[in-house]
């Protein structure tokens, strides 16, 4: 077994902003093992993160007993974002290109991807129908880039894993921009953070309004 395959519960990291839960700006929801938070440098209004409370390196390191809870939060985020904004994409850098070294899944309401997107990037990605696929890749190869989109033509969701290579990453994300309804603010994080306060507050208000009549 490689070091990547061990799933023992990690200790909090004193230097990790996601471990210091009380310092997070906008927490939308808390469950036993996860937090749903507004991204502090949003690419678009509605950009949120699903973050495990424990300090796992990436979703490929999550133990199976957290799968149902993680899935339920993804479904919850999908329903909310589709209703309040547009269908989301989910992506995770899987240690590769992480700005915080703590697992976090991005949900970004860019809209469904056209058929052309799947045709262009499907050839270089590996299907990832469950978290088991992430765990297998992480145990065997370490870093990865994960992306899940909704097909515009069918409404079905499709998840792919990509090798952690910069040219692949920029090709996939560039193609995604060309095949979704909404163009996110692909600007430097510092500028997004400076402009993000209003978007975070708007997201929090929309989240609580949406769920107050449904929970």
Regions found by a protein language model. Name each.
Residues 1-215:
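HIT superfamily nucleotide-processing domains
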């Amino acid at each position: 077994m490689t070091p990547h395959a061990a799933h023992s519960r990690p200790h909090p990291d004193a230097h990790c902003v996601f471990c210091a839960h009380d310092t997070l700006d906008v927490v939308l929801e808390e469950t036993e093992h996860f937090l749903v938070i507004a991204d502090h440098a949003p690419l678009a209004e509605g950009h949120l993160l699903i973050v495990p409370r424990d300090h796992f390196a990436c979703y490929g390191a999550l133990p199976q007993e957290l799968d149902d809870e993680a899935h339920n939060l993804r479904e919850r985020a999908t329903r909310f974002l589709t209703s309040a904004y547009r269908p989301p994409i989910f992506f995770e850098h899987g240690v590769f290109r992480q700005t915080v070294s703590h697992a976090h899944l991005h949900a970004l309401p860019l809209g469904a991807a056209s058929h052309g997107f799947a045709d262009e990037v499907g050839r270089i990605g590996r299907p990832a129908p469950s978290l088991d696929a992430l765990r297998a890749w992480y145990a065997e190869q370490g870093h990865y880039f994960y992306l899940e989109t909704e097909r515009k033509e069918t409404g079905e969701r499709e998840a792919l894993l990509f090798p952690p290579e910069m040219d692949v990453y920029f090709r996939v994300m560039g193609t995604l921009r060309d095949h979704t309804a909404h163009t996110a603010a692909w600007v430097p994080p510092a500028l997004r953070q400076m402009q993000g306060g209003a978007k975070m507050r708007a997201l929090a208000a929309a989240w609580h309004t949406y769920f107050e009549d449904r929970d």
